Amino acid sequence: MKRSSVSSGGAGRLSMQELRSQDVNKQGLYTPQTKEKPTFGKLSINKPTSERKVSLFGKRTSGHGSRNSQLGIFSSSEKIKDPRPLNDKAFIQQCIRQLCEFLTENGYAHNVSMKSLQAPSVKDFLKIFTFLYGFLCPSYELPDTKFEEEVPRIFKDLGYPFALSKSSMYTVGAPHTWPHIVAALVWLIDCIKIHTAMKESSPLFDDGQPWGEETEDGIMHNKLFLDYTIKCYESFMSGADSFDEMNAELQSKLKDLFNVDAFKLESLEAKNRALNEQIARLEQEREKEPNRLESLRKLKASLQGDVQKYQAYMSNLESHSAILDQKLNGLNEEIARVELECETIKQENTRLQNIIDNQKYSVADIERINHERNELQQTINKLTKDLEAEQQKLWNEELKYARGKEAIETQLAEYHKLARKLKLIPKGAENSKGYDFEIKFNPEAGANCLVKYRAQVYVPLKELLNETEEEINKALNKKMGLEDTLEQLNAMITESKRSVRTLKEEVQKLDDLYQQKIKEAEEEDEKCASELESLEKHKHLLESTVNQGLSEAMNELDAVQREYQLVVQTTTEERRKVGNNLQRLLEMVATHVGSVEKHLEEQIAKVDREYEECMSEDLSENIKEIRDKYEKKATLIKSSEE
């Protein structure tokens, strides 16, 4: 049975106070982010973001005192950056859910819910903290005063790697404070779970048992190694920097434990040196050829392709071999039949030889028999040569048949590949239209398969080609018609642009005329002002010489004023006439622009019905903008005249 990796035995550590030193590559307990209820097991530990070495030493409660050696000491006041996503609302809600579940499951005396934990008060936080810390220190009671110093101090003593400020204790439920505090409470819950598991776990080692069983994380604990670690740590805390005695003692115990043979150590060392040399050689080869893995992968892919080709070739050879085996079986049967006939002939020869031996032949009979035997032997030799020639011819025909079959299969593979690309096969493909264009090669069918596939493939394929050519011709005709329509539209657009350009030139001329009239009116005003100024000077002159003809000067002044009023009235009348003329011109332009706009809208509607996608810009909108612009100018001119 596997034991938990957290032990409470002799080498286990019951205190939850912070260890003297922490692994620099670990930042502390990281709250699990899974949505399921967390169970006790291996806790996730993240690496710090800072690359510099940071001292995570807290208060040490060991009885050995402080360490005097300067080796291995890295101190820094740099704060560790919290890697947890405290700005993530989902993460904070998960932490709140874990806190609420833990409080509910462990008999928290007060009512608590997800809603109440969104922004708790300081009083509620202190109750929750006291309840949680009671699992680690049952006799603890939170003091009534200076809790803002007590709570951060307890977290620091427990080894919480991130600082909690005093000011955050006054604003626990604030949006900028609560995420840090609820993450610290979840960390405290993880510590409680570890502490509970350490209490409930059995001792790692029994008496007289130097080796422990394999734990859940696959680690095989060793009592000798743990004792050695304890002694080295105590010596290290006493100020020692070398541990040769402990190393020698451990080495002797390990030799006794494993019955180490000193003679075998030399062979193992030599083997180790050879392996190290081989590793160095392989490292050098890797440095010399960094892309060797890629080249090996390419070679592997090439070899796999060759293997596939050879497998296909072997399958062809097997099919050919099966055909040859069938023919060989036929030949063996023929040979057996011939051998049987030969045996029958031998028996007949034996019988005839016996008859010959038992009877008396003349010399002529013997010569005749020998002559017949020679003729039969020549016939046999000739037939044997003919048989060998026929067998060679049969072999050549079989080779020719195999090559032809391979060529046909290659052409069929290319045909099927092209048909799949054209979506003609399988039968339910997009362009098959219910026809089966797949050709299954069957050499045993003979010439009848050609007629079958001609009716199955050639005729439907010819129909598809004719339909495709008709669709292409229709598309070309449609394209030509659309191109003609596009040319007509372009001509109409050019004509409309020319009309708009003419209207713009007329409007520009009207603007120039208007500016000229305004300039003339301003010059007239300046002229009147200069005359008025001269009259004012003359008035002052008359006032200085009032004793020389006051009545005459007053009469002259009245005449000049009447003349001035007449000039002002004349100027006002001219301005009114110019404004009326300009307004009439603008109304004429607006009327003309409206008629052009209406005509263009009709043309655009007609064009949209014929070819909706050919319009790239809306000319009526530009004309509307020009019309609105000049209507605004006409309104401004009217208001300025009034």
UniProtKB/Swiss-Prot annotation:
Modified residues (Phosphoserine): 44, 55, 62, 69, 165, 242
Segments of skewed composition (Polar residues): 18-33, 63-74
One Pfam family linked to the record: NDC80_loop
Region annotated Nuclear localization, chain positions: 1-250
Chief localization: nucleus
Domain of life: Eukaryota
InterPro entries: DUF5595, Kinetochore_Ndc80, Ndc80_CH, Ndc80_sf
Region (Disordered): 1-74
Keyword Ligase set for record: no
Compartments where located: Nucleus; Chromosome, Centromere, Kinetochore
Consequence recorded when altering residue 53 to R: Impaired acetylation, leading to reduced kinetochore-microtubule attachment
A GO molecular-function descriptor: kinetochore adaptor activity
Gene Ontology cellular component list: centrosome; chromosome, centromeric region; cytosol; kinetochore; membrane; Ndc80 complex; nuclear speck; nucleoplasm
Biological processes, Gene Ontology terms: attachment of mitotic spindle microtubules to kinetochore; attachment of spindle microtubules to kinetochore; cell division; centrosome duplication; chromosome segregation; establishment of mitotic spindle orientation; G2/MI transition of meiotic cell cycle; kinetochore organization
Region listing for Interaction with PSMC2 and SMC1A, in residue ranges: 361-547
PANTHER family in alphabetical order: KINETOCHORE PROTEIN NDC80, KINETOCHORE PROTEIN NDC80 HOMOLOG
Record's subunit section: Component of the NDC80 complex, which consists of NDC80/HEC1, CDCA1, SPBC24 and SPBC25. The NDC80 complex is formed by two subcomplexes composed of NDC80/HEC1-CDCA1 and SPBC24-SPBC25. Each subcomplex is formed by parallel interactions through the coiled-coil domains of individual subunits. Formation of a tetrameric complex is mediated by interactions between the C-terminal regions of both subunits of the NDC80/HEC1-CDCA1 subcomplex and the N-terminal regions of both subunits of the SPBC24-SPBC25 complex.
Protein's name according to its UniProt entry: Kinetochore protein NDC80 homolog
Lineage of the organism: Eukaryota, Metazoa, Chordata, Craniata, Vertebrata
